[in-house]
Amino acid sequence: MNNRSLFALLVSLALAPLAGAAEPPAEKFDVVIKGGMVYDGTGEKPRVIDVAIRGDRIAGLENFSAEQAKTVIDAKGLAVAPGFINMLSWSTESLIEDGRSQSEIREGVTTEIMGEGYSMGPLNDRMKERMVHDQGDIKYEIKWNTLSEYLRYLEQHGVSCNVASFVGATTIRDFVIGLEDKQPTPEQLEQMRELVRKEMEAGALGIGTSLIYPPAFYAKTEELIELCKVAAKYKGKYISHMRSEGNQLLQAIDELLRISKEANIPAEIYHIKAAGQPNWNKADAMLAKIEDAQKAGLKITADMYTYTAAGTGLDACLPPWTEDGGYPALFKRLRDPATREKIKAEVQTPTDTWENLYLAAGSPDKILLSGFKSEKLKPLTGKSLAEVAKMRGKDPIDTAMDLIAEDESRIDTIYFLMSEENVKKEIVKPWISFGSDEASQAPEGNFMKSNCHPRAYGCFVRVLGKYTRDEKVLTLEQAIRKLSGLPATNLGLDHRGFLQKGMFADVVVFDPATVGDRATFEKPHQYAVGMKHVFVNGAQVLKDGEHTGAKPGRALWGPGKL
């Protein structure tokens, strides 16, 4: 070999590694969602781009080749968005029955937030015994004591959605005081504060209240402020079903603002509304009061459901003193003729001292009975209180008292209380997110033994279909922000709510042209349509509109967790 040939060989050998470095092997991903219109959860305009998933994280947003992925999803013509967050879930028991969370997943919900007043911990033996006694169609063992133990139980049991919870102020009160109408002693209040501290350090999101219901109704504002001061130290939030959504709506907002200010804690209003036709004209003042507080520096937000009917118990027709001492005391009172006459007189009398949903509905034909504990009464499911009263030949109020006593439960009930005009006024507000105020459901098994509110199947897709595509109340980027990025930010959820590199891969793919709700008040057990694919922590839970059976959901924790 001459010198020139030797020199050429040495040069080629030296350059070989550089040539290889110029073209590194293509990065590999578990999933690439190709060609979809990507809405990142910020509210910014969408863009057509690919989304790559590796493990439980979003690995990148750019143009990838199909060869780079084990699985490729063709999303051309479809919307790709962060998974939705249900700010008010009552799936506390339904997830034990069926961890697949079918109705939620088929709407694109990937995280369920619990804890409206009552939470699944902390519990003592007395509370556990009562919970077992009060169980309806869903039966389960209580294998936990604290709220964090319950969330870990769900995770180990297997759930398709992520789960997180506020600690219920009612649960804290019940643990220490019981169900009686009395105020805590200084020692009891300190015990309540200590329970809050332990749950916040274990990962609770903050304090949740439901102040129209006994025994929460018995708590004074000062008690709530003291509990919230503890939660605030752990960057928690106060979230409330306020003391009134009707006659005393504006005063109830004042109470929430006072708690937020004095405890130095962000506050959120559950299912914001002006309930009862005489109060519909308060919606503008309600929204203005909140926005004035925001301008003054308070961190106030809200959530809502997308229907004009509320759902709670038939016992919400009765004055709160009837439940002093709990349900056994209520049932005893309802069987006493003299006490019944007193109750009936109070139900018929307009008042500002308690939230009377019988009068707020305006008529017993706007009170729909949706779920009974007793097999004997289940045939009445789906009938109005007016219909049942006529069947029995009795006054509607007497009928309501009879039914509660016979069923020995609060009886699931739907009340038609709100105006569509106000729903639209609320839905456009950039600080309002969404919560179903329902349990996850499925059109099978124990779930078919009662009629849920249709919001269990349709709350979130109704935002995308009815209010965005059809009525154009929102743009799609606005709607998706309110379903994902906004609640994730409000809750301080770590690396959730946005489609960005490094975020957890909670991702939904849906057809904007067909997405929508099918559930009705007459036939609520009907899945939403238009949701194509759903990923939770990188695992595919919905594929081509069908549940895969995967249960990759995790317990999520508040920012104060130690």
What spans do the regions from the language model cover?
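Bacterial N-terminal signal peptides
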Residues: 8-17
